[in-house]
Amino acid sequence: GKDYAAVGAWRRDPIDNLSHGATPMQVARFYYLLQTGRLVNAQASAEMKELLGNSAIHHKFVKGLELTDPTAVVYRKSGTWGISHADGALVERRDGSSFIAAAIAEDPRGGQWLSQIIIQMDRLVGSGEGLPRVRRTNVPGSSGDASVSSGG
């Protein structure tokens, strides 16, 4: 962890010694807990959604979703450092479905790639009629076997 100030990092990532960092899977898990009201508790999840739902920057995932589903509600956090671009989002679509997206790109065009990736993801979710739904019965990253079932 590190404050956004000139002071040094107080707790660095144990793998790469980063002061700010999360894998796409960690980001997806965060949004899963947020959507299910288990990010601390239901009240904290609702407050966090309120904070994440007002993106003032329309790039990366938001830019792509504005083209495919401009009425979607997007809870997101993005970041850019040099040529590294990251975005993570919980997307609630106008048809009532929702999905989680998380991606990192290391290229000067990474922001454009993320806009294109989310367009394709949104199209896949939107065309999922008739496909069996997959349900995870435990929280990703928790201890124990992950149980995945289709249906419902």
Question: Which residue ranges define each predicted feature?
Answer:
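Structured C-terminal helix/loop/strand segments within mature extracytoplasmic catalytic/sensor domains
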Residues: 16-152
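Flexible glycine/proline-enriched surface loops and loop-helix/loop-strand junctions
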Residues: 7-15
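Short, charged, amphipathic alpha-helices and their helix-cap/turn boundaries
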Residues: 1-6
